[in-house]
Amino acid sequence: MEQTYQYAWIIPFLPLPVPMLIGLGLLLFPTATKSLRRMWAFQSVLLLSIVMIFSMNLSIQQINSSSVYQYVWSWIINNDFSLEFGYLIDPLTSIMSILITTVGILVLIYSDNYMSHDHGYLRFFAYMSFFSTSMLGLVTSSNLIQIYIFWELVGMCSYLLIGFWFTRPVAAKACQKAFVTNRVGDFGLLLGILGFYWITGSFEFRDLFQIFNNLISTNQVNFLFVTLCAVLLFAGAIAKSAQFPLHVWLPDAMEGPTPISALIHAATMVAAGIFLVARLLPLFIVIPHIMNFISLIGIITVFLGATLALAQKDINRGLAYSTMSQLGYMMLALGMGSYRSALFHLITHAYSKALLFLGSGSVIHSMETLVGYCPKKSQNMVLMGGLTKHVPITKNSFLLGTLSLCGIPPLACFWSKDEILNDSWLYSPIFAIIAWSTAGLTAFYMCRIYLLTFEGHLNVHFQNYSGKRNTPLYSISLWGKEGSKISNKNFRLVTLLKMNKTGRPSFFSNRVYKIDENVRNMTPPFLSIPNFGNIKTSLYPYESDNTMLFPILILFIFTLFVGFLGIPLNQDVDILTKWLTPSINLLHKNSNNSIDWYEFCKDALFSVSIASFGIFIAFFLYKPVYSSFQNLDLINSFFKMGPRRNFYDKIKNAIYDWSYNRGYIDAFYGTFFIVGTRKLAEFTHFFDRRIIDGIPNGVGLISFFVAEVIKSVGGGRISSYLFFYFSYVSIFLVIYYFLNL
C-alpha cells in the first residue's frame, strides 16, 4: 500500500502529454496531426482512464485502512524560509480524483462525436486534457502555494474553453467576463494566503492547521485580522463556485460547447470552490464568524439561483442557474459544519448535472439539424417541445436527471439534499425555511425545463401561436426579448398564451398552427464553423449517435445508484462515512454518524411532498395546451376573475422580470462598476491632461508670452532702455516712500 501512495504524484501529470504533443504537432506538422485527430482523442481517454483506475485503487485502500498520506519535497531551505512541494492523498483527494476522472472520461467520449464537425477538434481536446491536469493538480496539492498555482491554471483553462468559439463576439465577451470576475476572487485568495502565512509561517496544510489552532487556543492572534484573512480566502471560492455576489459569469459561460459546461458544472471549475472550503474547513471551523458568513452566502445563493432559473429560455442557462443553486446548498452545508453532507451532495449533483448537460447537448445536437448552427435557436426552448418520440433515450435520461435534482427517491440527489435540509433545521429555522422552499422551486423550474423541451408539439415547425400570418416567429414574449416587431405585450411565465378579444391573455384557447414553409432556410451558418455551410437540415430531429448516447447511459446508471454510497445498507456505517472517517475525525471528535430511520422517513416525506408540489405547479402551468386541462371550465373561470387575475398577473410579471433580468445584478454591476469605472477613467484622463500636464505647460506658456512682451518692448534703442530704467526706479522709490510713512 505504501508503494501505491508513493507513485500517486503521477496523477496530475498523466493527462499532460496530450495537450503538449497536440500543441507541438499543430506547430510542426499541422497536416499530419489533423489527419490523426481521432488518435489524439483516444489517447486523451486512455490516459485519463489510467488515472481513474489509479484513483479507484487509492480510494479502496483508504476505505479499508482510513489512512492519509503526504509526501513533501523541500526546494529552498534556510533559517527563515522554506519552499516545499508535494502531494496529499486523503479522502477528499480520492473523492475529487474519481469525480474528475469519471466525468472527464465520459465527457471526452461524448465530445468525439459532438465536436466532430468543428475545425477546432484538436484544440478542444488539448484544452480539455489540460483542464483535467489542472484540476487533478489542485486536488492533490499539499500546500497553499500549489493550490494557488493550479487554481490559476483552472481559471485559465476555463477562459480558453468558454471562449472556444472566440470568433463569436458573445463568446469572446463571456470568457472575458468569467476571467475578470474570477480575478476579483483570486486576488482575495492570494491576499488570504499571504495573511495566513504571516500568522503561522507555513503554507503546508498540516502545519498550518496545527499552528493556527494552537494560536487560537492561546489567544495569540488578532481575531479581526484572522477573520479578514479567512474572508479573503473564501472570496476565491465565492468566485470559482459562482456564489453571490460573484456569480454573474456562470450563465454567460454557456457560450462554449455544451460538453465544456458538463465538465465545468460537474467536476472541475465550480467544484474547485467547494473543494477549497472543504480543504480549509479545519481552519475556518475555529472562526465562528467566518462559518456564519459561509452559510449566509450559501443560503443567499441557494434562493437566488433558483429564482433566476424560473424564466430562462435557454436550456443551458437554466441548468447553469440550477448549478448555482445546488452549489449554494453545498456551501450552506459547509458553513453549518456538515462536511459529509456537502461532499455527498457534491458527488450526487456532479453525476446528475453531467447527465443533464450531456442530455441537453444531445437535444441541441438534434435541433441543429432543423435550425442549423445558431445557439440562440438550437438552445432556445421555444423552438423545442414534442421531442419525446424523436429522441426517446435522451428524453428518458434527461427525465431521470430532472427527477434526481428535484429530490425524488431513490435517485442520487434525494439522499444528499435531504441530509442538508435536515441539518439546516438544527442550524437556523430561517435558513431551513429558505432551503426547504427552494427545494420546491428547484422541482418547479427543472420540471419546467423538461416539459418545454420534450412535451407538446415540435414548436420550430409553427410559424406563430396566434393564427396571424404576419406575426413573426419569435412573437411570444414569454421567451424573452427575442424580438416581436408587432406585439409588445408581456406574456410571462406561462407558455403559449394568446390574446383574447378583451386584450387579456387566456390560458386555454383554440389555436391555429401554421407550418413554416421556410423552416429549412431559417438559420444561416456561423462563420467560425465552415462545415455548417453545407449542412442539410431536416423536418424532424433524430437521436444522437451511439458515441454520444453511451456516456449518457453510464451517467444514467450513476444517477440511479450513486446515492446508495451514503446509505447504511445491512451495515453499521455507510461506505461514504467510512471513506471520510479521517477527515470527519479531524473536524468532529467522537462524532456520531448513526441514522435515525424514523426521523429520516418523516423528513423525507416532507421534502418529497414539497418537490411533488413544485412538479404539480409546473405541470399545471406548462403542460401542453392541447391536454385535457383545456376543457376544465373551473380552471378557466378561476383565471378569468378580474381582481384576482390582475393580482396574479402582477405577481407573475414581477417574478418574470426578476428572473429574466438576472435579478438586476448584472445591470447594477454594469451601472456602478463598469460605467463608474469608465467615468472615473475619463475624469482621471481629464485631470491628467488639464491639471497635471496643464500646470507645467501653463507656466511654460506664460513665461513664453511674458518674454515675447518684453522682447517686443525693447527695440534696441538706448533711450528706450534709459526710460524704462528710470521708470522702474521711480516706481520703486514711490513704493518705498509710502511703506515708510
UniProtKB/Swiss-Prot annotation:
The keyword Signal does not apply. Keywords: Chloroplast, Membrane, NAD, NADP, Plastid, Plastoquinone, Quinone, Thylakoid, Translocase, Transmembrane, Transmembrane helix, Transport. It is a multi-pass membrane protein. It catalyses: a plastoquinone + NADH + (n+1) H(+)(in) = a plastoquinol + NAD(+) + n H(+)(out); a plastoquinone + NADPH + (n+1) H(+)(in) = a plastoquinol + NADP(+) + n H(+)(out). GO terms for molecular function: NADH dehydrogenase (ubiquinone) activity; quinone binding. Gene3D superfamilies: 1.20.5.2700. GO terms for cellular component: chloroplast thylakoid membrane. It is found in: Plastid, Chloroplast thylakoid membrane. GO terms for biological process: ATP synthesis coupled electron transport; electron transport coupled proton transport. The chain crosses the membrane at residues 9-29, 40-60, 89-109, 125-145, 147-167, 185-205, 219-239, 258-278, 289-311, 327-347, 354-374, 396-416, 425-445, 549-569, 605-625, 721-741. Its EC number is 7.1.1.-. It is an enzyme of class 7 (translocase). Belongs to the complex I subunit 5 family. NDH shuttles electrons from NAD(P)H:plastoquinone, via FMN and iron-sulfur (Fe-S) centers, to quinones in the photosynthetic chain and possibly in a chloroplast respiratory chain. The immediate electron acceptor for the enzyme in this species is believed to be plastoquinone. Couples the redox reaction to proton translocation, and thus conserves the redox energy in a proton gradient. NDH is composed of at least 16 different subunits, 5 of which are encoded in the nucleus. This is NAD(P)H-quinone oxidoreductase subunit 5, chloroplastic. It comes from Symphyotrichum cordifolium. The gene is ndhF.
